[in-house]
Amino acid sequence: MRKIPRTMSTQHPDNARVPEWSRSEVISGESEVIEAYLAYEHYEVDEVMWDAEGKDVDTHVVRKLLTQYPEFFKEKILGRDIFLTYRIPNPKIEGAEKKVFAETMESIPITYDLAEKFFNTKPTPPVFEVILPFTTDYKELIAILKYYEVAIVNKENVKLVDDIYVKDLIGEINPKSIEIIPLIEDRDSMFKIDQIVGEYIKAMKPPYMRVFLARSDPAMNYGLISAVLSVKYALNRLGKIEKKYGIKIFPLIGVGSLPFRGHFNPMNFEKVIDEYRGVYTFTVQSAFKYDYEDNEVINAIRKINEREISEFELLDEEEEKILHRIANVYTSSYQPIIESLADVINKIALFLPRRRARKLHIGLFGYSRSTGKVTLPRAITFTGALYSIGIPPELIGISSLSTLTEKEWNVLEKNYKYIKHDLQAAARFVSYESIDLMKETWNVNEEIIKKIMEDLSYAENTLNIKIGDSNSVGRKHALISSLALIALKEGNIDEAKSYLLEMAKIRKSLG
């Protein structure tokens, strides 16, 4: 059995601080190659996700890694000891990126040839897995695998003229097949994960499977509680699929540093591992790596890599139904507030610092994200915008839990163990003064402000969550939030931008 990575370094632009080695505030181009190397060598992460989705991708990354750091990659073999995994555009959704999908897939055999030349022998394929975002149907997975086999590998046997074949011009094409990791990003797909993963296993009979569950985008689209419960439901179902088909499933989860996006950081990783039992691989995003002390980061990653993997937590049918109902109730309270705040969120998001060179995606779940009737920014800047105006998104919609029965509460607390811990971590950054300033500056509907106040009141009076923070961190963040909103009201954009960055540094993540 191959090694399955336990940590995956990603290019999510959630870092407030810029790493010392970066040539500019926006990490791009050659800096991302350096970043990939440092993820392996300095942080000792098992896997790097190379993102070809929504940005200018460098498909020559393997060539650059092998030529710039030959001694390291002779010791640590790509595809055996450490891994580089492409996140490809989904050609079904992202029309403008269809050819980028093709280009990225075509680069896989090139990486094989480079490794063959580098080692002077038949190598382990350095790249053999791809992540398919927004997977909603098992046939999409089969189509990607067949595309690689039919359109890329089989063309070596195409006859060009007389006895000259494609293989005679470009050589043999390897690897002959690849593996695919579905990335499940929407709530409906998580609740029907059997129809995606189960049907794929029935059709393709893989020896094992890695399944990637999003945690960040579902939070933005459906609210914190709905996102956590959707992932818990999906993990439970993956455990049942594993038993049913007798193949090992290795789940990945995409988690950021702040509670809304996963709460996975060097100070809280142990609780997150305990929360999401059965998960094999956790993402190590940019804020995790660059917004904490270096020794804290390295020690945390070492512990994550060395940990025991816990068993899946399986639910009975009634518990599954209750999770589904709570998720629906929560979302129906959360979404109208977000729709009403969309204008404010989009305006603030424009002034948060950019940390990656990204192209904008268009579409249902592209990088301009749609929830209900409005378009929102990326999840990172969405989260950062709400923190910046003193309304951590973790608390939006929370008063809907008042409708739960005692039994439903018990199921919720059993399946979201650290709910109060996460809410308390977020509630430190609530600022009533900023909420008042926001109301004045953008003329936000009074009814929406009332709903937000009901959520904060419920958190404080029913859940015993302390709102605001009397220590220096929370007070400083609240003060700077007010200053930022005053600067925006007066049209002092540069001043506001500096305040927004300062707040991000205080909370150790952009969003």
UniProtKB/Swiss-Prot annotation:
Q: What is the lineage of its organism?
A: Archaea, Thermoproteota, Thermoprotei, Sulfolobales, Sulfolobaceae
Which family is annotated?
A: Belongs to the PEPCase type 2 family.
Gene behind this protein: ppcA
Q: Which cofactor does it need?
A: Mg(2+)
SUPFAM superfamilies to which the protein is assigned, alphabetical: Phosphoenolpyruvate/pyruvate domain
In its UniProt record, which GO terms are filed under biological process?
A: carbon fixation; oxaloacetate metabolic process; tricarboxylic acid cycle
Enumerate the InterPro entries for this protein: PEP_COase_arc-type (IPR007566), Pyrv/PenolPyrv_kinase-like_dom (IPR015813)
Instruction: Report which reactions are catalysed by this protein.
Output: oxaloacetate + phosphate = phosphoenolpyruvate + hydrogencarbonate
Q: State any single GO MF term.
A: phosphoenolpyruvate carboxylase activity
Task: Please report the name of this protein according to its UniProt entry.
Answer: Phosphoenolpyruvate carboxylase
Q: Which Pfam families match?
A: PEPcase_2 (PF14010)
Main function: Catalyzes the irreversible beta-carboxylation of phosphoenolpyruvate (PEP) to form oxaloacetate (OAA), a four-carbon dicarboxylic acid source for the tricarboxylic acid cycle.
Organism whose genome encodes this protein: Sulfurisphaera tokodaii (strain DSM 16993 / JCM 10545 / NBRC 100140 / 7)
* UniProt KW keywords: Carbon dioxide fixation, Lyase, Magnesium
